[in-house]
């Protein structure tokens, strides 16, 4: 097998391929140009977008040329894959703003040389399509019967599929044809939910141009606990630090189930397989900390990752820098008078209601400093502060806040 494909396979990336042997032979013959698409349907990428981007970087490191297609045209329709309802329709101004934000995030992650990765926006060729010509030249090659066998459409037929969304596969296939013509693209990569669209695109190129092109998909990641990768109780795990703080981002990875640590180190870091195996021999917690640090470093930068690491160590290990923790300011007057612990946990955002706080205390999951809170009616005052005038409050093993008084500020 071609070394680049072998690397992806060894790390757990490959789910399906149109013809793995043929693709391997083509890659052995020399560098090829491939593409991955992302629709700008939001202001930030989330972790669910990133597995194909890790694969892109592996392929580029092996000497191949990557194209990131920003779906400024297709996003006006919305991909029905994996969706139970029609997406909100967005205008061009919003899509342009989202596209700019996404490109900035990818620039940071890829840190690339533009000779190896380039961007295109399918709005450039989709926005001015003549509908009649498109139906004759592209639509004639699609079978509705075959399209309805794809999982994305089968699921939506039960809840309602608009004709607008039904066109999405034709447009994505036309993207593959256009990129093949303009940039000699020979491979499309993406998540396994894109398999039907990718196969349809490869088939269109073969029918219209008589060329053989390829498709490669990656697994849709779920955690060992059944949770969809990148999903939290608060929603998606976004890369934008204004939506998900780097500390919370770090903690998400630090709390990876034991069974997933090796798999995620191989998929979401660029550590060698040998280094991954070596770190696992040092203990699962050491491996989890390295996973959290590496992913945070790749997404937010080394300095930010260091701060998140020190904050986590301060919260849970008794060392590190407490200043790196999420911080909430209380007035000195509040602590002089005292505040009920249930009110405190709600005020700092560790609980949504007093009932939640009482339940947390009853279950033994509330901590002020190093002390577990046992009394639902406890009052927290200045005596709870450490010598530096701060105190760490914690809900369970994952959520923590550093409290400071206004005097310190």
Curated annotation (Swiss-Prot):
Coiled coil: none annotated. It is found in: Cytoplasm. GO terms for cellular component: cytosol. Belongs to the class-I aminoacyl-tRNA synthetase family. TyrS type 1 subfamily. This is Tyrosine--tRNA ligase. One of its GO terms (biological process) is tyrosyl-tRNA aminoacylation. The keyword 4Fe-4S does not apply. Catalyzes the attachment of tyrosine to tRNA(Tyr) in a two-step reaction: tyrosine is first activated by ATP to form Tyr-AMP and then transferred to the acceptor end of tRNA(Tyr). SUPFAM superfamilies: Alpha-L RNA-binding motif (SSF55174), Nucleotidylyl transferase (SSF52374). The gene is tyrS. Homodimer. A motif ('KMSKS' region) lies at residues 228-232. It comes from Treponema pallidum (strain Nichols). InterPro entries: aa-tRNA-synth_Ic, Rossmann-like_a/b/a_fold, S4_RNA-bd_sf, Tyr-tRNA-ligase, Tyr-tRNA-ligase_bac-type, Tyr-tRNA-ligase_bac_1. ATP binds at residue 231.
């Amino acid at each position: 097998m071609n070394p680049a494909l072998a690397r992806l396979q060894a790390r757990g990336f490959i789910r399906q391929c149109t013809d793995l042997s043929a693709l391997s032979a083509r890659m052995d013959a020399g560098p090829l140009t491939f593409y991955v698409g992302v629709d700008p349907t939001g202001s930030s990428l989330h972790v669910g977008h990133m597995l194909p981007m890790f694969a892109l970087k592996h392929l580029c490191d092996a000497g191949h040329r990557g194209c990131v297609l920003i779906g400024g045209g297709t996003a006006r329709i919305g991909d029905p894959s994996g969706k139970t309802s029609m997406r909100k329709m967005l205008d061009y101004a919003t899509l342009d703003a989202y596209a700019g934000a996404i490109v900035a995030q990818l620039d940071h992650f890829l840190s690339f040389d533009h000779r190896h990765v380039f961007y295109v926006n399918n709005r450039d060729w989709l926005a001015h399509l003549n509908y009649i010509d498109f139906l004759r030249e592209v639509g004639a090659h699609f079978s509705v019967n075959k399209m309805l066998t794809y999982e994305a459409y089968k699921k939506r037929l039960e809840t309602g599929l608009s004709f607008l969304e039904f066109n999405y596969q034709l447009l994505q296939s036309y993207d593959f044809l256009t990129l093949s013509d303009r940039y000699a693209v020979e491979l499309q990569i993406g998540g396994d939910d894109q398999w039907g669209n990718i196969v349809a695109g490869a088939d269109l190129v073969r029918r219209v141009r008589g060329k053989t092109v390829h498709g490669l998909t990656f697994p849709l990641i779920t955690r060992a606990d059944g949770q969809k990768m990148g999903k939290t109780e608060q929603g998606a795990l976004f890369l934008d630090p204004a939506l998900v703080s780097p500390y919370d981002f770090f903690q998400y990875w630090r709390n990876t189930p034991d069974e997933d640590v090796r798999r995620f180190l191989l998929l979401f870091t660029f550590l060698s397989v040998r280094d991954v195996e070596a770190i696992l021999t040092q203990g699962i917690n050491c491996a989890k900390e390295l996973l959290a640090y590496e992913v945070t470093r790749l997404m937010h930068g080394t300095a930010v990752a260091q701060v998140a690491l020190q904050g986590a160590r301060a919260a849970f290990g008794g060392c590190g820098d407490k200043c790196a923790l999420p911080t909430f300011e209380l007035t000195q007057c509040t602590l002089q008078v005292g505040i009920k612990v249930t009110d405190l946990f709600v005020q700092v955002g560790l609980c949504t209601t007093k009932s939640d706080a009482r339940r947390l205390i009853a279950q033994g999951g509330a901590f002020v400093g190093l002390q577990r809170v046992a009394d639902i009616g406890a009052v927290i005052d200045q005596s709870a502060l450490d010598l530096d005038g701060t105190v760490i409050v914690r809900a369970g093993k994952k959520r923590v806040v550093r409290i400071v008084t206004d005097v310190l500020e």
